[in-house]
Protein backbone atom coordinates (compact mmCIF):
# COMPACT_ATOMS: atom_id res chain seq x y z
CA UNK A 1 0.00 0.00 0.00
CA UNK A 2 1.21 3.46 -0.82
CA UNK A 3 2.19 5.92 1.85
CA UNK A 4 0.34 9.17 2.09
CA UNK A 5 2.03 12.32 0.95
CA UNK A 6 3.06 15.23 3.14
CA UNK A 7 2.45 18.75 1.91
CA UNK A 8 5.79 20.43 1.38
CA UNK A 9 6.65 23.49 3.40
CA UNK A 10 7.24 26.57 1.23
CA UNK A 11 10.87 27.48 1.02
CA UNK A 12 10.84 31.19 1.70
CA UNK A 13 7.38 32.75 1.94
CA UNK A 14 5.53 32.57 5.24
CA UNK A 15 2.02 33.85 5.66
CA UNK A 16 1.58 35.37 9.10
CA UNK A 17 -0.66 33.03 11.05
CA UNK A 18 -0.19 33.96 14.64
CA UNK A 19 -1.80 35.56 17.62
CA UNK A 20 -1.09 39.20 18.42
CA UNK A 21 -0.50 41.89 15.77
CA UNK A 22 3.16 42.88 15.43
CA UNK A 23 5.32 45.46 13.74
CA UNK A 24 6.50 44.93 10.19
CA UNK A 25 10.10 44.51 11.39
CA UNK A 26 9.19 41.83 13.91
CA UNK A 27 7.04 40.03 11.37
CA UNK A 28 9.90 40.08 8.86
CA UNK A 29 12.26 38.65 11.48
CA UNK A 30 9.74 35.96 12.38
CA UNK A 31 9.27 35.02 8.73
CA UNK A 32 13.04 34.83 8.24
CA UNK A 33 13.42 32.47 11.19
CA UNK A 34 10.61 30.21 9.99
CA UNK A 35 12.02 30.17 6.46
CA UNK A 36 15.46 29.21 7.79
CA UNK A 37 13.91 26.48 9.92
CA UNK A 38 12.14 25.08 6.88
CA UNK A 39 15.39 24.97 4.96
CA UNK A 40 16.99 23.03 7.80
CA UNK A 41 14.00 20.67 7.95
CA UNK A 42 14.45 20.05 4.23
CA UNK A 43 18.00 18.77 4.78
CA UNK A 44 17.30 16.95 8.05
CA UNK A 45 19.20 19.37 10.29
CA UNK A 46 16.80 19.13 13.21
CA UNK A 47 18.87 21.02 15.78
CA UNK A 48 19.27 24.13 13.66
CA UNK A 49 15.62 23.90 12.67
CA UNK A 50 14.58 23.85 16.33
CA UNK A 51 16.96 26.68 17.19
CA UNK A 52 15.38 28.95 14.59
CA UNK A 53 11.87 27.92 15.58
CA UNK A 54 12.61 28.68 19.22
CA UNK A 55 13.79 32.15 18.21
CA UNK A 56 10.64 32.59 16.13
CA UNK A 57 8.51 31.50 19.06
CA UNK A 58 10.11 34.15 21.24
CA UNK A 59 8.68 36.71 18.82
CA UNK A 60 5.22 35.10 18.61
CA UNK A 61 4.47 32.24 21.03
CA UNK A 62 1.16 31.48 19.28
CA UNK A 63 2.16 31.19 15.63
CA UNK A 64 0.55 28.31 13.72
CA UNK A 65 3.36 28.10 11.15
CA UNK A 66 5.89 27.67 13.95
CA UNK A 67 3.78 25.02 15.68
CA UNK A 68 3.46 23.08 12.41
CA UNK A 69 7.19 23.22 11.70
CA UNK A 70 7.96 22.02 15.23
CA UNK A 71 5.52 19.16 14.66
CA UNK A 72 7.37 18.05 11.54
CA UNK A 73 10.68 18.15 13.39
CA UNK A 74 9.34 16.04 16.26
CA UNK A 75 7.66 13.61 13.88
CA UNK A 76 10.95 13.15 12.02
CA UNK A 77 12.88 12.54 15.26
CA UNK A 78 10.36 10.01 16.56
CA UNK A 79 8.92 12.21 19.32
CA UNK A 80 5.35 11.44 18.35
CA UNK A 81 3.48 12.77 21.38
CA UNK A 82 5.21 16.12 21.04
CA UNK A 83 4.54 16.12 17.29
CA UNK A 84 0.82 15.56 17.83
CA UNK A 85 0.71 18.28 20.47
CA UNK A 86 2.32 20.76 18.08
CA UNK A 87 0.00 19.82 15.20
CA UNK A 88 -3.02 20.34 17.44
CA UNK A 89 -1.64 23.67 18.62
CA UNK A 90 -1.21 24.79 15.01
CA UNK A 91 -4.79 23.89 14.12
CA UNK A 92 -6.19 25.44 17.28
CA UNK A 93 -4.40 28.68 16.43
CA UNK A 94 -5.37 28.61 12.75
CA UNK A 95 -8.05 26.01 11.86
CA UNK A 96 -7.93 27.17 8.23
CA UNK A 97 -4.26 26.24 7.74
CA UNK A 98 -4.96 23.35 5.38
CA UNK A 99 -1.34 22.39 4.82
CA UNK A 100 -0.91 21.81 8.55
CA UNK A 101 -4.15 19.81 8.65
CA UNK A 102 -2.99 17.69 5.70
CA UNK A 103 0.33 17.03 7.41
CA UNK A 104 -1.43 16.20 10.68
CA UNK A 105 -3.63 13.75 8.79
CA UNK A 106 -0.53 12.21 7.20
CA UNK A 107 0.96 11.89 10.68
CA UNK A 108 -2.18 10.12 11.93
CA UNK A 109 -2.05 7.78 8.92
CA UNK A 110 1.57 6.93 9.63
CA UNK A 111 0.56 5.99 13.18
CA UNK A 112 -2.16 3.64 11.91
CA UNK A 113 -4.98 5.94 13.04
CA UNK A 114 -6.82 5.71 9.75
CA UNK A 115 -10.29 6.76 10.87
CA UNK A 116 -8.97 9.97 12.44
CA UNK A 117 -6.82 10.63 9.39
CA UNK A 118 -9.81 10.19 7.09
CA UNK A 119 -11.72 12.88 8.96
CA UNK A 120 -8.84 15.34 8.73
CA UNK A 121 -8.21 14.67 5.03
CA UNK A 122 -11.92 15.07 4.35
CA UNK A 123 -11.82 18.50 5.98
CA UNK A 124 -8.80 19.48 3.88
CA UNK A 125 -10.61 18.57 0.65
CA UNK A 126 -13.34 21.08 1.52
CA UNK A 127 -10.87 23.96 1.16
CA UNK A 128 -11.38 24.82 -2.50
CA UNK A 129 -8.52 27.35 -2.44
CA UNK A 130 -5.90 24.92 -1.09
CA UNK A 131 -3.29 24.16 -3.75
CA UNK A 132 -2.72 20.67 -2.34
CA UNK A 133 -6.35 19.63 -2.73
CA UNK A 134 -5.67 16.92 -5.37
CA UNK A 135 -3.13 15.36 -3.01
CA UNK A 136 -5.65 15.55 -0.16
CA UNK A 137 -8.20 13.62 -2.23
CA UNK A 138 -5.50 11.05 -3.04
CA UNK A 139 -4.64 10.68 0.63
CA UNK A 140 -8.32 10.43 1.51
CA UNK A 141 -8.64 7.55 -0.93
CA UNK A 142 -5.63 5.77 0.58
CA UNK A 143 -7.21 6.14 4.03
CA UNK A 144 -10.45 4.64 2.82
CA UNK A 145 -8.60 1.67 1.35
CA UNK A 146 -7.16 1.01 4.79
CA UNK A 147 -10.66 1.29 6.26
CA UNK A 148 -12.01 -1.30 3.77
CA UNK A 149 -14.20 1.25 2.01
CA UNK A 150 -13.51 0.65 -1.69
CA UNK A 151 -16.47 2.69 -2.91
CA UNK A 152 -15.36 5.69 -0.85
CA UNK A 153 -11.77 5.22 -2.00
CA UNK A 154 -12.85 5.13 -5.63
CA UNK A 155 -14.85 8.33 -5.18
CA UNK A 156 -11.82 10.08 -3.67
CA UNK A 157 -9.41 8.84 -6.36
CA UNK A 158 -11.86 9.95 -9.05
CA UNK A 159 -11.87 13.46 -7.58
CA UNK A 160 -8.07 13.45 -7.42
CA UNK A 161 -7.86 12.45 -11.08
CA UNK A 162 -10.38 15.10 -12.10
CA UNK A 163 -7.88 17.66 -10.82
CA UNK A 164 -4.69 15.89 -11.88
CA UNK A 165 -5.08 13.33 -14.66
CA UNK A 166 -1.43 12.29 -14.36
CA UNK A 167 -1.58 11.25 -10.71
CA UNK A 168 0.16 7.90 -10.97
CA UNK A 169 -0.87 6.63 -7.53
CA UNK A 170 -4.56 7.38 -8.12
CA UNK A 171 -4.42 5.74 -11.57
CA UNK A 172 -2.80 2.65 -10.12
CA UNK A 173 -5.21 2.30 -7.22
CA UNK A 174 -8.19 2.82 -9.52
CA UNK A 175 -6.85 -0.03 -11.64
CA UNK A 176 -6.79 -2.34 -8.64
CA UNK A 177 -10.27 -1.26 -7.55
CA UNK A 178 -11.75 -1.83 -11.01
CA UNK A 179 -10.05 -5.22 -11.25
CA UNK A 180 -11.42 -6.25 -7.87
CA UNK A 181 -14.88 -5.19 -9.10
CA UNK A 182 -14.49 -7.52 -12.10
CA UNK A 183 -14.19 -4.71 -14.65
CA UNK A 184 -11.05 -5.83 -16.46
CA UNK A 185 -11.51 -3.39 -19.35
CA UNK A 186 -11.46 -0.39 -17.02
CA UNK A 187 -8.62 -1.93 -15.03
CA UNK A 188 -6.59 -2.21 -18.24
CA UNK A 189 -7.44 1.38 -19.16
CA UNK A 190 -6.24 2.72 -15.82
CA UNK A 191 -3.13 0.56 -15.95
CA UNK A 192 -2.38 1.84 -19.45
CA UNK A 193 -2.73 5.43 -18.27
CA UNK A 194 -0.48 4.64 -15.30
CA UNK A 195 2.18 3.19 -17.61
CA UNK A 196 2.07 6.35 -19.72
CA UNK A 197 2.89 8.60 -16.76
CA UNK A 198 5.21 6.06 -15.07
CA UNK A 199 7.16 4.18 -17.77
CA UNK A 200 9.46 2.76 -15.07
CA UNK A 201 6.75 0.84 -13.28
CA UNK A 202 6.83 0.29 -9.54
CA UNK A 203 6.50 -3.24 -8.11
CA UNK A 204 2.84 -2.50 -7.45
CA UNK A 205 2.39 -1.34 -11.03
CA UNK A 206 3.86 -4.59 -12.34
CA UNK A 207 1.68 -6.55 -9.93
CA UNK A 208 -1.43 -4.90 -11.36
CA UNK A 209 -0.27 -5.86 -14.85
CA UNK A 210 0.24 -9.43 -13.66
CA UNK A 211 -3.18 -9.63 -12.08
CA UNK A 212 -4.91 -8.20 -15.15
CA UNK A 213 -3.06 -10.64 -17.41
CA UNK A 214 -4.00 -13.50 -15.10
CA UNK A 215 -7.66 -12.44 -15.04
CA UNK A 216 -7.85 -12.12 -18.83
CA UNK A 217 -5.81 -15.24 -19.62
CA UNK A 218 -3.12 -13.28 -21.48
CA UNK A 219 -0.20 -15.67 -21.05
CA UNK A 220 2.28 -13.55 -23.01
CA UNK A 221 1.65 -10.51 -20.83
CA UNK A 222 1.66 -12.69 -17.73
CA UNK A 223 5.12 -14.04 -18.54
CA UNK A 224 6.44 -10.59 -19.42
CA UNK A 225 5.24 -8.95 -16.22
CA UNK A 226 6.42 -11.82 -14.05
CA UNK A 227 9.87 -11.67 -15.64
CA UNK A 228 10.05 -7.91 -15.12
CA UNK A 229 8.95 -8.18 -11.49
CA UNK A 230 11.50 -10.93 -10.80
CA UNK A 231 14.38 -9.15 -12.52
CA UNK A 232 13.70 -5.61 -11.32
CA UNK A 233 12.27 -6.18 -7.85
CA UNK A 234 13.20 -9.68 -6.67
CA UNK A 235 13.10 -8.67 -2.98
CA UNK A 236 9.82 -6.77 -3.18
CA UNK A 237 6.77 -7.84 -1.14
CA UNK A 238 4.80 -7.83 -4.40
CA UNK A 239 7.05 -10.46 -5.98
CA UNK A 240 7.04 -12.63 -2.87
CA UNK A 241 3.26 -12.41 -2.59
CA UNK A 242 2.85 -13.30 -6.25
CA UNK A 243 5.11 -16.34 -6.02
CA UNK A 244 3.36 -17.52 -2.87
CA UNK A 245 0.04 -17.23 -4.68
CA UNK A 246 1.37 -19.31 -7.57
CA UNK A 247 2.56 -22.06 -5.24
CA UNK A 248 -0.85 -22.63 -3.66
Predicted regions, residues:
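Bacterial Sec signal peptide processing site at the extreme N-terminus
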Residues: 6-29
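Terminal, low-structured helical/coil segments at or just beyond the last alpha-helical repeat
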Residues: 16-24, 193-248
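Structural marker of alpha-solenoid helical repeat scaffolds
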Residues: 25, 59, 92-94, 127-129, ...
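Canonical tetratricopeptide repeat
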Residues: 35, 69-72, 103, 137-139, ...
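Register position in tetratricopeptide repeats
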Residues: 42, 76-77, 110-111, 127, ...
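TPR alpha-solenoid repeat register
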Residues: 66, 100, 134-136, 170, ...
Amino acid sequence: MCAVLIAQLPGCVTEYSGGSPMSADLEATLNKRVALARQYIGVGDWENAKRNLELAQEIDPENAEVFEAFALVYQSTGEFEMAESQFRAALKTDPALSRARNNFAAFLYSRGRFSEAEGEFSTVTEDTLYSGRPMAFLNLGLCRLQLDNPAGAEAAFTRALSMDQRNSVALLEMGFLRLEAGDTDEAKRYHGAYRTVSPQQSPRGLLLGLQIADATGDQDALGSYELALRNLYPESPEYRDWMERQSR
